[in-house]
């Protein structure tokens, strides 16, 4: 509390010694009013001055102002960046409710930042704001898709082709090895917990895309440090739509979509397979005869059986208005039903959004109430079925048949599986696993989840001293999820469980999450003459609670399989306590200064290391406001920005890493024999570091914003350097010094640097024609600079599992290299450039191939350059647009090719798998050595360009006497991909760039309708 009082005292001192807001506010002719845009939305920060004097004020959060002029004939001038300036005499009735028109040549507007807003022209940090009209169009279900390719420095890696799949978002690369690299998501001033449980893992999935007004991405520390300990990976602020205008308006948006599989795993057709078997395993040999005997007489395309054409639809209705100019409101409901391209997969979502903003006491007191609810149901199809369908024998019947040809439902419910016997006598071949159809239809894995995100924000502007206001924010984010995972009676999976005995079984897992927020800050915003001061200090308290519980039952008897713990032992909680402040000061809108400070305490650390102080500072020079450029017709904007700051990281994967924790032993050798009572399992201690502390990231940023020809050409360029210290890493402990061989501790460092740019062009802008083109790109490089206490050049951490091989780890973390750098054997090729099976380079020249012959490549999944491109073209009521993104210098290990590069068959396994078409190219027919799986021949350049969406629409502004509007549009998503990568898709879900057999992302055709009443 002492920290907060110190900050507040600073504000009061500033208030005491700051010059008066105007020179004549206590006498003369009073003018009061509200300034709004053409949609009725209040404009915050508009300048209202008495022309020819220094008497001026700025509009408040509701666009309101009050000024005393010399007399009724005085000229009042109202201006705001990006809007046309209006001059009226003080007695004009138009000033009571003044609507500003947008200036087509202006490029600036108000941007939401942490704990407030700022004019874009006054920003000092690296901040990018994306408004609704700039979002990616199309049948968007996942909110993160609206940002894809839009923001330089923001890399969005989509999930697989499953409905509701989560994307991986990185802002300026990774800043940690073992802690989270996800950005902080803040929705309407409520920081969101990342872990929402199954079905709610992605916080952006909880928001209906149609409810979003804008995104603001805080990239550098000078902008993000106000969020302190959670801002090392950047901050994404999501602002939802609010009430506006006066007349109630109803809007509907809906779409119907058809999704098709964009690609299949490249395996042989039944005909190709038979021909190849005849060539490689001809009859007349022992092996050939056995292989030939396993050929069937059917032609089965298993991938066709498991994939389908999916139909999806989405509907949203919203009501927006303002009651008596005192209560803006907005309410919306939405429903999404999305089939997956894999049979049985499905995603449903229902959303409700409500916003009320009543104001009292002549708009000095404003209450903002936001409530968002979402209910989801997601059935997961087994991701393993994609690979299983690709390699199941294409010459066998997909079903067990009776003698009359009908399906034999008594044997594994009719679906073909490897085993012996029929009916109840069926014995599964557990080494081979369930068949593709059994995986889909005999298992139901469905998560149903509910989430509520809401807050009540009370903002009071002090009567008689309107420059000072107080803000109280009470927020709640609560979610619950229940996951059902069931195996049908009589299924292959039921027979593989010796306890189930063919009955089948099911389990329930419940997850509960609660995030409570209390924040209070004071803000002083004053303008006098050429000076503008905006200072804020606040306090934040946040509590996170979670509990998880699961239990299993048998289908036949519903008896419990395991113990049902009525009081879950995995309840966890953590707290964040913070004091923060920010000071913005500008002189003549030319010289801009920003200083922020946040003091955070996290219960995840001990009392000795709990507090972390995160400062930042920035300076910007509005060069375009200087006299030598102010009247320039060519240069409309030019601003230089410089910033430095520190942010922290406390999302370290554990709530109690500094405490000694005990775990129930699962090893029978770690038990105490109790005679007839059986074995008593020990509680064994885990390793811990009582001095574990924050990871700290220091960021340096230099940027230039520019605009030419009245904003027809505009953009920005940024250079940044991020250095993370006290990086968490698992290190080997000296014998006897801790309760484990390794312990997680602060010991490493890493560096991330890059250059970002953003370019926007308006080459055509006439009455009927408008053309806008946008392009942004990011060059980046990341490497470790320290990983342990010694300078051992050979120290490394191996990671990244592949399907085959011993140890299965293909990647490495090492000083001087990027995270997840590939660690391979070097392939040997013949004189024609063909790979020689099991021939690898003996790099240490000891006459044999060992692990010592692997080498650290200079290749990683992290792209050297990634970019986005967009185009919008309109002619009268027609509009056309597209969005695309791509990357260069990213590498992928084709694990699908590695694991299936030979036609060698284990004839004793009892099955005949299909072959990848790759075997015709490699010519590999023998068994691969353990080292061949790691060959760099499977490491491929996965640079690509993806056309994300193409859209064509027409807007009906008037139909008869109807005063509403309607837009009809057709679009295609995931249109095409240009790449040299041989796999299904060059964008691999996650961050490690290892491509097994991913669920292909579908191509979507959508018809959309938007109606405004």
Q: What residue spans do the PLM features occupy?
A:
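Short, small/polar-rich motifs associated with maturation and membrane association
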Residues: 1-8, 12-374, 382-383, 388, ...
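Short aromatic-centered micro-motifs
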Residues: 48, 78, 185, 585, ...
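Short, solvent-exposed loop/turn motifs
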Residues: 42, 84-87, 191-192, 364, ...
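Conserved small-residue
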Residues: 251-297, 745, 762-861, 980
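Extracytoplasmic gating/loop element in the C-terminal half of outer-membrane beta-barrel translocons
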Residues: 291-293, 437, 602, 834, ...
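Glycine-rich, aromatic-lined ligand/substrate-binding cores of catalytic
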Residues: 861-893
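Hydrophobic beta-strand positions
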Residues: 35, 50, 58, 400, ...
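Extracellular/periplasmic, surface-exposed regions of secreted and cell-surface proteins
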Residues: 135, 140, 182, 284-285, ...
């Amino acid at each position: 509390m002492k920290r907060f009082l110190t900050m507040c005292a600073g504000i009061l001192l500033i208030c005491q010694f700051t010059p008066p807001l105007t020179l004549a506010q206590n006498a003369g002719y009073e003018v009061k009013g509200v300034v709004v845009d053409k949609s009725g939305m209040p404009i915050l920060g508009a300048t209202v001055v008495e022309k020819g004097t220094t008497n001026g004020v700025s509009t408040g959060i509701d666009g309101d102002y009050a000024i005393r002029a010399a007399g009724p004939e005085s000229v009042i001038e109202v201006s705001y960046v990006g809007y046309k300036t209006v001059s009226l005499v003080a007695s004009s009735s138009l000033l009571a409710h003044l609507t500003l028109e947008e200036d087509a040549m202006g490029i600036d507007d108000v941007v939401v930042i942490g704990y407030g807003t700022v004019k874009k022209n006054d920003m000092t940090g690296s901040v990018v704001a994306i408004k609704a009209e700039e979002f990616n169009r199309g049948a968007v279900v996942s909110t993160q898709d609206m940002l894809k390719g839009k923001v330089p420095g923001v890399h969005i890696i989509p999930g697989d082709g499953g409905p509701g799949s989560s994307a991986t978002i990185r802002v300026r690369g990774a800043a940690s090895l073992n802690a989270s690299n996800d950005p902080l998501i803040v929705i309407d001033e409520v920081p969101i917990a990342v872990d929402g449980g199954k079905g709610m893992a992605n916080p952006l999935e909880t928001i209906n895309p149609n409810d979003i007004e804008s995104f603001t991405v805080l990239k550098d520390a000078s902008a993000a440090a106000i969020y302190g300990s959670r801002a090392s990976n950047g901050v994404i602020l999501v602002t939802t739509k609010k009430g506006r205008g006066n007349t109630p308006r109803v809007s509907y948006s809906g779409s119907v979509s058809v999704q098709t599989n964009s690609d299949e795993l490249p395996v042989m057709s039944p005909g190709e397979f038979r021909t190849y078997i005849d060539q490689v395993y001809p009859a007349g040999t022992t092996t050939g005869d056995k292989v030939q005997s396993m050929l069937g007489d059917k032609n089965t395309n298993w991938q066709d059986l498991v994939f389908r054409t999916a139909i999806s639809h989405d509907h949203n209705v919203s009501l927006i208005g303002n009651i008596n100019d005192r209560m803006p409101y907005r309410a919306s409901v939405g429903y999404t039903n999305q089939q997956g391209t894999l049979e049985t997969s499905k995603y449903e979502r229902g959303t409700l959004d409500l916003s009320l903003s009543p104001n009292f006491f002549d708009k000095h007191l404003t209450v903002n109430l936001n409530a968002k609810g979402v209910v989801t149901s997601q059935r997961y199809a087994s991701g393993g079925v994609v690979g299983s369908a690709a390699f199941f024998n294409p010459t066998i019947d997909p079903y067990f048949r009776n003698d009359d040809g009908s399906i034999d439902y008594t044997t594994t419910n009719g679906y073909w599986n490897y085993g012996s016997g029929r009916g109840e006598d069926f014995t599964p071949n557990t080494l081979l696993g369930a068949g593709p159809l059994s995986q889909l239809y005999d298992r139901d894995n469905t998560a149903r989840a509910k989430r509520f995100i809401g807050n009540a924000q009370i903002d009071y502007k002090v009567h008689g001293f309107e420059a000072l206001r107080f803000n109280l924010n009470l927020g709640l984010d609560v979610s619950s999820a229940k996951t059902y995972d069931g195996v049908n009676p009589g299924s292959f999976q039921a027979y593989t469980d010796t306890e189930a005995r063919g009955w089948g079984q099911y389990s329930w897992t419940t997850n509960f999450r609660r995030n409570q927020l209390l924040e209070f800050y004071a803000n002083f915003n004053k303008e006098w003459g050429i000076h503008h001061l905006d200072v804020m200090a606040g306090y934040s308290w946040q509590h996170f609670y979670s509990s998880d519980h699961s239990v299993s039952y048998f289908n036949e008897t519903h008896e419990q399989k395991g113990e049902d713990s009525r009081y879950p032992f995995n309840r966890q909680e953590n707290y964040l306590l913070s004091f923060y402040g920010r000071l913005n000061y500008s002189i003549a809108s030319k010289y801009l200064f920003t200083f922020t400070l946040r003091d955070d305490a996290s219960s995840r650390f001990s009392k000795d290391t709990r507090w972390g102080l995160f400062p930042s500072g920035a300076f910007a020079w509005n060069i375009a406001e200087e006299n030598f450029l102010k009247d320039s017709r060519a240069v409309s904007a030019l601003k230089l920005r410089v910033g430095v700051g520190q942010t922290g990281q406390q999302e370290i994967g554990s709530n109690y890493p500094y405490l000694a924790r005990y775990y129930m032993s699962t090893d029978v050798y770690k038990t105490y024999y109790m005679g007839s009572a059986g074995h008593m399992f020990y509680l064994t201690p885990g390793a811990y570091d009582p001095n574990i502390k924050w990871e700290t990231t220091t960021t340096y940023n230099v940027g230039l914003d520019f605009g030419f020809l009245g904003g027809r050409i505009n953009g920005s360029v940024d250079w940044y350097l991020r250095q993370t210290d006290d990086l968490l890493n698992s290190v080997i402990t000296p014998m006897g010094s801790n309760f484990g061989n390794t312990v997680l501790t602060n010991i490493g460092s890493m560096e991330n640097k890059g250059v970002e740019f953003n370019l926007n062009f308006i080459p055509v802008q006439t009455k009927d024609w408008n053309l806008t083109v946008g392009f942004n790109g990011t060059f980046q490089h990341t490497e470790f600079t320290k990983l342990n206490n010694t300078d051992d050049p050979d120290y490394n951490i191996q990671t990244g599992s592949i399907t085959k091989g011993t140890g299965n780890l293909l990647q490495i973390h090492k000083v001087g290299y990027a995270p997840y750098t590939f660690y391979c054997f070097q392939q040997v090729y013949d004189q024609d450039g063909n790979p020689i099976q099991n021939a690898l380079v003996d790099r240490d020249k000891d006459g044999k191939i060992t692990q010592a012959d692997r080498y650290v490549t200079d290749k990683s999944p992290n792209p050297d350059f990634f970019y986005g491109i967009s185009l919008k073209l309109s002619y009268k009521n027609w509009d056309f647009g597209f969005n695309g993104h791509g990357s260069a210098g990213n590498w992928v290990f084709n694990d699908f090719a590695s694991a299936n590069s030979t036609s060698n068959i284990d004839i004793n396994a009892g099955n005949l798998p299909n072959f990848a078409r790759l075997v015709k190219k490699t010519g590999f027919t023998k068994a691969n050595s353990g080292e061949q799986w790691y060959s760099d021949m499977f490491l491929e350049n996965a640079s690509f360009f993806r056309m994300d969406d193409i859209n064509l629409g027409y807007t009906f502004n008037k139909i008869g006497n109807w005063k509403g509007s309607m837009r009809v549009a057709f679009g295609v998503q995931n249109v095409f991909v240009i790449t040299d990568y041989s796999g299904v898709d060059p964008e691999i879900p996650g961050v490690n760039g290892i491509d097994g057999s991913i669920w292909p992302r579908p191509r979507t055709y959508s018809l959309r309708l938007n109606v405004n009443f």
